[in-house]
Amino acid sequence: MISKLSVSPTFSPSYNIIVDSVLDFSHILEYVTNKQVLIVTNTTVAKLYLTKFLAALVDDLDVNTCILEDGEQYKSQQSLDKILSTLLENNFTRNSTVLVALGGGVIGDITGFAAAIYQRGVDFIQIPTTLLSQVDSSVGGKTAINHQLGKNMIGAFYQPKVVYTSIEFYKTLPQREYIAGMAEVVKYAFISKDFYLWLDSNRDKILAKDSVTLIEMVKRSCQIKAQVVAMDEKELTGARAILNFGHTFGHAIEKCQNYRGLKHGEAVGVGMAQAIDFSHYLGLISQQQAKDFKDFIVSFGISIDFPKDICQKEFLEAMLLDKKNSNKELKFILIENIGSLSLQKQSKNELEQFLDISR
């Protein structure tokens, strides 16, 4: 069973997302024919899927691999340099090069960024192997590496030629990674009321990992993101900002833990709960709404407990570095109802007072 949808960004060429019930790498062959191919993956995914992927490629392809360490802390300048050095040392040229990101969000982000800057832009393909990367980071063209002062601070908007994935990847995906991915899925439920109702009615099948339901879940999640990206590919109008619901708080959590604590999806889950509580604090939603929204998050196995090892001063400093901020104004994605999110400016004092009473 295959589900296919198209992404039509504001400025970039359209491309397909292919969601497969089985794992068939032959779907990307048309995109690598007569190309120099660099497969970028990590140590974990390489052990599981690299041999199978290489076997699917035709014999006359010029193929190299670049295997990085596994973890958010390796979404770094050092890892980027390793990719670029591999390209240069093997004489990859602009018109014949295609990079293949075989892995989760970290691999997709750093490979996409390498593709964006190598010789001013070469082709790349996304093969996301985690639920989170399938529904979020592989779609929409955001590519980046982290800096010691903030997450995703060095990057570019750069779209892939195609996204191919399969729910068969879940067979080797740790449960913690699966639940972390569900946080991004649940985020889309707060953006779309129809999807909220669909998730609510299909919760048991999702938690049981029913194949047909999971394909539909991934497809619907990608459709929501694709619709937003079509309106505001490069965050010029503010429409795309709603995709960052939970991320202002979540990124600050990751930064405070030096990217070695909560996984990105886990931090987003906590971040959504924080954004919901902040919305209640500001009078945008009732106490009952806040409870219902947080209960919905938890019902998918997602923890919303704020890490106890983070001090408020450090957390506030991390939030001040958020990319959405401008002219010293703090910007948050807040919620007024299911399907009603908005980008709002708040003062530093308002945030400090909220943090004081919420700890």
From Swiss-Prot:
It catalyses: 7-phospho-2-dehydro-3-deoxy-D-arabino-heptonate = 3-dehydroquinate + phosphate. It is an enzyme of class 4 (lyase). The keyword Kinase does not apply. It comes from the Bacteria. Binds 1 divalent metal cation per subunit. Can use either Co(2+) or Zn(2+). CDD domains: DHQS. Signal peptide: none annotated. Transmembrane segments: none annotated. GO terms for biological process: amino acid biosynthetic process; aromatic amino acid family biosynthetic process; chorismate biosynthetic process. Zn(2+) binds at E184, H247, H264. Keywords: Amino-acid biosynthesis, Aromatic amino acid biosynthesis, Cobalt, Cytoplasm, Lyase, Metal-binding, NAD, Nucleotide-binding, Zinc. It is found in: Cytoplasm. This is 3-dehydroquinate synthase. It comes from Francisella tularensis subsp. novicida (strain U112). Its EC number is 4.2.3.4. Catalyzes the conversion of 3-deoxy-D-arabino-heptulosonate 7-phosphate (DAHP) to dehydroquinate (DHQ). Its cofactor is Co(2+); Zn(2+); NAD(+). InterPro entries: Dehydroquinate_synthase (IPR050071), DHQ_synth_AroB (IPR016037), DHQ_synth_fam (IPR030963), DHQS/DOIS_N (IPR030960), DHQS_C (IPR056179). Belongs to the sugar phosphate cyclases superfamily. Dehydroquinate synthase family. One of its GO terms (molecular function) is 3-dehydroquinate synthase activity.
